[in-house]
Amino acid sequence: MAEDYLTDSASILSEAKAAKEMGRHHRAIRLSQESLELTLKAILRSVGVEYPKEHDVSDAIEENLEKFPEWIRSVTSKLEEGSTWLSERRGTSMYGDEIAGKPASQLFTSEDSAKAVEYASHAVEVARRLFDEMFRTA
């Protein structure tokens, strides 16, 4: 299942990159969040952790560091940061700011979408390396 999650996550990331290129920054953020969330859940599942049923799984990554290879521990802070940053923007990237009456398309910039895509891309790269080590060398 973990490998299937990663395949789906990479596909979603491609959609996020396309949305960014089209200037649909809110969509790039939403899709990047979905990609990163699914990637982190794949990483957790790959080491036998049943992930929490929530969007930000950064705490679960932190709580299970000992289950990961040493190299991945050096990059978990960026994974956790991305998970938190994207999760905080998940709702507004979809629905906008209902109190202010602003649609999602008016809330985010190209810098925001670039940051979102970078977080998701980094997570996919980390997961691919981990999976290559775990599943293809066994």
Set out the residue ranges of the language-model regions.
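Terminal alpha-helical segments
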Residues: 1-138
